[in-house]
Amino acid sequence: MDVRSIEDVAPVVEHNGTVPVWWLVNPREMFDITKGGHLELVSEFEVAGGGLVDPHHHPTHEFYYVTAGRGIMEIEGETREIRQGDLVHIPPMAMHSLRPVTDNASIHCFCFAVATPDADAINYTEH
């Protein structure tokens, strides 16, 4: 499971020494695997305590960046706790789900997806 945390990356000072940047995905690092694709979506979502994003898959590279809370991420049968500052890469067609670690607290994420060149339109409301 590809999970990257700002806690594991040293910031690089950019913009004339005024802005620390934590590169969770280095420039062009995913060029080959996303080549020919397009930006499918950008969203923000919250899974309430006791909630669950049911297992599902998409023909996209999907990325979740945790902005608040903690959750249990499962991708293709591998389970890992994720928390604020983590970036999760979900490969195309990988079965995945997410739930908060407790029934009393939510997890809040920023999400974006890059579709593969041959991907059909996706109806996200069905998931």
Name each model feature, range by range.
Residues 23, 42-46, 63, 79, ...:
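Conserved hydrophobic/aromatic beta-strand scaffold that supports enzyme active sites
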